[in-house]
C-alpha cells in the first residue's frame, strides 16, 4: 500500500508564507484521522464517512484544493483516500502552528493535571487553584506559545473559547482537563500546505481541468469568533463565484440563509439591485455603555410620468 510521506520546506516573503510538504513515496500504511488532532470549531468530523463516499464521484480528478482549510481534516481525508492526487491545504487559520507546538500544549496540560490532583471532574475551579492555573499559563506565555483554543476545551464551559490571556482571565474554569496527550503524527503528510487568500488560490488552480474545489467557508448566520476573519454578506456571496464552472464540494449550515437566497435569486432573475441609486440615512442606537447597533433607512422615488 503506497502512501505519501513528506519532508518540509518553507518559503517566506513579507506577506505570504507557504509550507509545502513534498511527496515522497514509501511503503507504509498510515493512520487516517477521523477528527482533527487538536480542537477546531467547525471541523467536519461528522461528515467524514459521507465525504469519503462523495470523493468517489471525482475519480477522474487529479487536484483537490481545500480553499478554507481550517483544521485540515478534509485535506487529510482526501489525501488518504486519493494518495495519487495533489491536495492543496490552505491553512489560513495557521492551524499548523498549533500542531507544531503540540508538545508544549501537552506539557502545559500535564502540569495543570498535577495542580488539580484529585479535584472532582467538571467542578468549578476557584480560589488558589484557579490562581495557580493562571500563573502556570502566564509562565507558558512568557516563554513561548499557548494554544488557547485547545486550552479552552480543558478549562471552560462547553462552547466557550478564549483566544488570549485577557479573555481567559475573564471566564469561569472547570475541571475538564484532558487526561491523555494529543498526537498529530503524520497528519499533514503528503499535503501541500499554503496560506493564501482563497480567491487567489482559486484563480491559480481554476485553470486546471482536473481540479476540484473543497469549499467550507465560515457559515453565514453562525458564530465565527474563532476564525481569523470578519465576514459580511458580500463575503459569503463572493464564495459562490468560485463555484461557477468548477467541480466542487461545498459545505453550509441549516442556520445559514445562503441556499434560500440563491433559490430566491433563481426565481427572480431580473430584479437586479432594488436599492441602486437610493438615498441612505443611518442612525446609531446605543443599548448600553458597550453595545450599540445601526438602523438604516433607504429611500427612492420613481420618475414621475410626463
Task: Give names to the regions the model predicted.
Residues 1-4:
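Hydrophobic alpha-helical signal peptides and transmembrane signal-/tail-anchor segments
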Residues 13-59, 73:
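S-adenosyl-L-methionine
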Residues 65-78, 89-93, 153-158, 207-223:
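Conserved proline-anchored active-site loop of SAM-dependent methyltransferases
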Residues 80-84:
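Conserved hydrolase catalytic core segment
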Residues 86-188, 301-306:
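Class I S-adenosyl-L-methionine-dependent methyltransferase module
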Residues 173-179, 229-240:
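Well-ordered, non-membrane alpha-helical segments in soluble/globular domains
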Residues 194-236:
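Active-site segment flanking the S-adenosylmethionine/decSAM binding pocket
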Residues 236-306:
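Long, positively charged, glycine-interspersed low-complexity recognition regions
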